[in-house]
């Protein structure tokens, strides 16, 4: 094998965000751009001789090309073996599962998660460590530092690897193992949940609809829901984990036909022109079905790379914050969690509903910055079992990523045992613990300067806001959230502005770290309602006062010209 050493110069914009490096496809297709970042990873992470790497992505545009480049670079940088998903496909939680099961040195995941795909869309890359989780900040900071000083990269001169055939092939001295991307993950799910009970539920007339949003979870959903759980399908039941392969343009060479229980199951490089973000705005097709006539009993969706989830009942939406709390309160009903929970962790903007469950269970609840990487240390140290973010991410210590299908199966297991509707489960939870009324307002694509101006204004107002009275609400504390990791003592500053009120209400302002164009300003609103007679109120109606305060103190409309959010969750 001939190794080519290519001279290069640094790019200045390769600082990883919350979930790796995300840019427009056009940026990644620049000469040397992807190669520079991959070499920065390999230069930062000490690679033992003959180490094994996991590689795969969500199937978006440029995925296959990137996989081939990384395979050749891995061979040139001394890896002994790469486990790559068939067709270059691996959902993010499945990649974490494979890293952990096969005890590899780590993995490279190609995804921009919920961001749009296609030639004019987004692309992303991140490195996961040997525990299966996203690289912590000390590693991503080192990768960024390496990217700013890179002078050359190493790449093998070799032909492309056949990604659509399972089995081993040789790339120089390195073995490339094309693996079934679904099998290990599906087996893990079957070890955690009572598939027999869920199968009985689905055979009882209980109807589900899962929207894969033309993203990576389609093959996983078909294998688990159709093949293993016998959910109704209009498609041949044998099509599942071992039968799909992507052609050069990323389309399935054995098309998946519309199914009763799984919709939009065919992964497409542009996600069918949609925005693979499972929320009430972008998953509108599913929402219309669940809120329509003759609606199914249960609905769910996942995102581009399979790590997020949205849960719906018949004419009913479950907020991600409530979902985390409800899973924790009902974990004893699920085989994989019957021995109890060590603790719960939530991101700071996520509602405090989980805190109330943790208190009732007598276990700790940790508040971390946004980003799944902050949960990794807590899970590795055995401090927490369940974790969640308000941004439709829920998971546990079974892997080190949030996991969309895992959350869906957890809900189905609970419903199978309790034999109640989604709405009844949620309302009984509120009756027991009280309702944390919660909403997130996203202002997407704001000019970065204007968004930064809003945040600077708020930071400069801390002194005047302290103790301020807004009608019946009085400010108790305002700060820029800082987190000290209880495991390794590392400190993360500047994680979001909190306005805390005496009665427990909160307003949080945060700039998102996952977009690629402009800035996304998120406003999180939360109040606690113990009165069951008010639990029926619409969240936006109940949060009107907090919304007005947020807009007033941030001068958001004046500074951005936006008169309403892009997305309300």
Task: Specify the residue positions occupied by each region the protein language model found.
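Short glycine-rich or small-residue beta-strand-to-loop segments that form or flank ligand, phosphate
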Residues: 24, 51-58, 126-128, 207-210, ...
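Glycine-rich phosphate/diphosphate-binding loops that line cofactor/substrate pockets in enzymes
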Residues: 38-53, 195-203
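Gly/Ser/Thr-enriched, mixed-charge loops and adjacent short helices
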Residues: 2-11, 32, 119-240, 248-292
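N-terminal small/polar loop signature for handling phosphorylated ligands or for N-terminal nucleophile
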Residues: 39, 52-121, 223-311
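Phosphate-binding and adjacent anionic-ligand microenvironments
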Residues: 296-298, 302-304, 311-314, 335-527, ...
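Positively charged, low-complexity intrinsically disordered leader regions
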Residues: 1-38
């Amino acid at each position: 094998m001939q190794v080519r050493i290519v001279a290069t110069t640094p790019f200045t914009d390769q600082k990883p965000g919350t979930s790796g490096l995300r840019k427009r496809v056009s940026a990644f297709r620049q000469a040397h751009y992807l190669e520079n970042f991959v070499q920065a990873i390999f230069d930062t992470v000490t690679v033992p001789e003959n180490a094994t790497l996991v590689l795969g992505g969500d199937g978006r545009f440029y995925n296959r090309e990137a996989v081939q480049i990384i395979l050749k670079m891995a061979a040139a940088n001394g890896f002994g073996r790469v486990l790559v998903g068939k067709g270059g496909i691996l959902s993010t939680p499945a990649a974490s599962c494979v890293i952990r099961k096969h005890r590899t040195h780590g993995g490279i995941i190609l995804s921009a998660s919920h961001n749009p795909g296609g030639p004019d869309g987004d692309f992303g890359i991140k490195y996961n460590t040997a525990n299966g989780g996203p690289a912590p900040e000390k590693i991503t900071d080192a990768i960024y530092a390496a990217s700013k000083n890179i002078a050359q990269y190493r790449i093998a001169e070799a032909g492309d690897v056949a990604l659509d055939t399972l089995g081993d092939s040789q790339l120089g001295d390195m073995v490339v193992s094309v693996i079934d991307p679904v099998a290990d993950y599906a087996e893990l799910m079957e070890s955690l949940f009572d598939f027999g009970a869920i199968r009985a539920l689905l055979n009882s007339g209980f109807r589900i609809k899962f929207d894969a949003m033309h993203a990576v979870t389609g093959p996983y959903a078909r294998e688990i829901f159709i093949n293993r759980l016998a959910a109704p399908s209009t498609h041949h039941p044998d099509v599942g984990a071992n039968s799909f392969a992507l052609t050069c343009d990323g389309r399935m060479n054995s098309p998946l036909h519309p199914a009763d229980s799984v919709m939009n199951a065919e992964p497409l490089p542009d996600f069918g022109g949609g925005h693979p973000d499972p929320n009430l705005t972008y998953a509108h097709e599913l929402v219309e079905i669940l809120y329509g006539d003759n609606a199914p009993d249960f609905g769910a969706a996942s995102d581009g790379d399979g790590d997020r989830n949205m849960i719906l009942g018949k004419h009913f939406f479950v907020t991600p914050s409530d979902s985390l709390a409800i899973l924790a309160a009902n974990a004893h009903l699920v085989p994989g969690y019957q021995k109890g929970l060590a603790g719960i962790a939530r991101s700071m903007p996520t509602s405090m509903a989980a805190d109330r469950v943790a208190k009732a269970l007598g276990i700790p609840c940790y508040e971390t910055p946004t980003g799944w990487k902050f949960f990794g240390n807590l899970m590795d140290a055995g401090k927490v079992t369940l974790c969640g973010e308000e941004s439709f991410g829920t998971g546990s210590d079974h892997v080190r990523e949030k996991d969309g299908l895992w959350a869906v199966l957890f809900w189905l297991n609970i419903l199978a045992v309790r034999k109640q509707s989604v709405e009844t489960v949620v309302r009984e939870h509120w009756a027991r613990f009280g309702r944390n009324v919660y909403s997130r307002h996203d202002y997407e694509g704001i000019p970065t300067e204007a968004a930064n101006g809003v945040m600077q204004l708020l930071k400069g107002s801390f002194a005047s806001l302290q103790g301020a009275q807004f009608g019946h609400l009085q400010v108790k504390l305002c700060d820029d959230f800082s987190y000290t990791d209880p495991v390794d003592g590392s400190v993360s500053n500047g994680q979001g502005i909190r306005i805390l009120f005496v009665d427990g209400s909160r307003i949080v302002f945060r700039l998102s770290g996952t977009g690629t164009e402009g800035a996304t300003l998120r406003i999180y609103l939360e109040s606690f309602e113990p009165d069951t007679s008010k639990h029926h109120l619409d969240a936006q109606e109940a949060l009107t006062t907090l919304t007005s305060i947020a807009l007033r103190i941030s001068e958001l409309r004046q500074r951005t010209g936006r008169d309403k959010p892009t997305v309300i969750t």
